[in-house]
Swiss-Prot record:
UniProt key word Manganese: yes
Binding site for 1-deoxy-D-xylulose 5-phosphate: 133, 157-158, 182, 205, 218, 223-224, 227
Gene Ontology terms describing biological process: isopentenyl diphosphate biosynthetic process, methylerythritol 4-phosphate pathway involved in terpenoid biosynthetic process
Keyword vocabulary terms for this entry: Isoprene biosynthesis, Manganese, Metal-binding, NADP, Oxidoreductase
EC number(s) on file: 1.1.1.267
Protein name per UniProt: 1-deoxy-D-xylulose 5-phosphate reductoisomerase
Family statement: Belongs to the DXR family.
Binding residue positions for NADPH: 12-15, 38, 41, 132, 134, 211
Transmembrane segments: none
Record function comment: Catalyzes the NADPH-dependent rearrangement and reduction of 1-deoxy-D-xylulose-5-phosphate (DXP) to 2-C-methyl-D-erythritol 4-phosphate (MEP).
UniProt pathway annotation: Isoprenoid biosynthesis; isopentenyl diphosphate biosynthesis via DXP pathway; isopentenyl diphosphate from 1-deoxy-D-xylulose 5-phosphate: step 1/6
Gene Ontology terms for molecular function: 1-deoxy-D-xylulose-5-phosphate reductoisomerase activity; manganese ion binding; NADPH binding
Length: 394
């Protein structure tokens, strides 16, 4: 059997670097044919290109000539002089990489800029291993209409868990989905206690090692709100049948409750290499992708209700999803602006979700969901959030 040809979008980020680890551990199953990155770490991208032997490398920003020099230097150091991949540069580089000939496209880009690459990957016919939840959330019906059955395989640990659990019954037998949340670094704090939280504290996630935006979204639970919308779209389960529970140990990644009263859960130590491996190899499993639970050692798992008063983001996300249209895009864009302002020291931690709520309340939606209407709504949301943040700055 020939190895699956993999294109990795966002290769220098957390998902991308771990995906290369997965490929390294299973060279008989996978080979990397293309990489893309934003361009903020050209040296790492050059080393990745030489290491994987990718035929094409894309950068959204940065000097392609500098990248070519770095690749030559890395190739010489690795004893691979003469390796020269095609370099694709420009804002649409990831979209062009996504449209190349590959069996699987892993979209590990952060943010709604991943929408165009997601659509390009689906159009190409490749399986889409989706870590870029924002593209599905803001694209909604556009993304679903572009995908054939089974073409999108989730890489988020929660949705990967649900996909595995759903194999235990038919769609008609599913009662509800239960997404677990670690609770973030501020679990147990009241809304008042969250006012003085610093950016440094917000980035101290108790379980996962992620980028700035995703880590902050996990602290506000905006990320869990986005995951609820993603689960609703991926699995066609109504929002009122998707629950969120706090599970601080982050070993049970999500659960499916069936109509007979049984619950199937997926458990494993927190390690993103497992859902990444499943995304690349679905429906098969990759041996030794990650360490398993040690069932011979004593352990305690706890589950707690979500404090929706201190952390209103999940309910707010559900409301945006119920309204549909461009509301999820506005939710996401306003949040990204607010998170940037928070890390710039301009607003308080609790102002992030308050800003999202305020911008959503002013949005009227679009009569028809198109790529253009999504982009217009995002642009409006960012501008409106920016205006509100300028007024409410510390």
């Amino acid at each position: 059997m020939q190895p699956r040809r993999i294109a990795i979008l966002g290769s220098t980020g957390s998902i991308g670097t771990q995906a290369i680890d997965v490929v390294d551990g299973a060279p008989h199953l996978f080979e990397v044919v293309a990489l893309s990155a934003g361009g903020g770490n050209l040296a790492l991208l050059a080393r990745q290109a030489v290491h994987t032997g990718a035929a094409a490398v894309g950068i959204a920003a940065g000097d392609p000539r500098e990248l070519a020099v770095l690749i030559d230097e890395a190739a010489a150091a690795a004893g691979r002089s003469g390796y020269r991949p095609e370099i694709i540069a420009g804002p649409d580089a990831s979209t062009r990489i996504a449209g190349l000939d590959a069996d699987v496209v892993l979209n590990g880009i952060t943010g709604s800029i991943g929408l165009a690459p997601t659509l390009a990957a689906l159009k190409s016919g490749a399986t889409l291993a989706l870590a870029n939840k924002e593209s599905l959330i803001v694209g909604g019906s556009l993304v679903k209409a572009a995908a054939r059955d089974g073409q999108i395989v989730p890489v988020d640990s929660e949705h990967s868990a649900i996909a595995q659990c759903l194999r235990s019954g038919s769609a008609a037998e599913v009662d509800k989905l239960v997404l677990t949340a670690s609770g973030g670094p501020f679990r147990g704090r009241s809304g008042e206690e969250l006012h003085g939280v610093t950016p440094q504290e917000a980035l101290a996630h108790p379980t996962w090692d992620m980028g700035l935006m995703v880590t902050t979204n996990s602290a506000t639970l905006v990320n869990k709100g986005l995951e609820v919308i993603e689960a609703h779209l991926l699995f066609d389960i109504p929002l009122d049948r998707i629950d969120v529970v706090v599970h601080p140990q982050s070993v049970v990644h999500s659960m499916v409750q069936f109509v007979d009263g049984s619950t199937i859960a997926q458990a494993s130590p927190p390690d993103m290499r497992l859902p990444i491996a499943l995304g690349l190899g679905w429906p098969g499993r990759v041996p030794n992708a990650a360490a398993p639970c040690d069932w011979t050692k004593a352990a305690t798992w706890t589950f707690e209700p979500l404090d929706a008063t201190a952390f209103p983001a999940v309910d707010l996300a559900k409301d945006a999803a119920k309204q549909g249209s461009t509301f999820p895009a506005v939710f996401n864009a306003a949040n990204e602006e607010a998170v940037t302002a928070f890390h710039g020291g301009r607003i308080r931690f609790t102002d992030i979700v308050d800003t999202v709520d305020a911008v959503l309340s002013e949005h009227t939606g679009s009569s028809r969901l198109t790529v253009e209407s999504v982009l217009d709504a995002e642009s409006w949301a960012r501008a409106r959030a920016h205006e509100r943040l300028a007024v409410s700055s510390l």
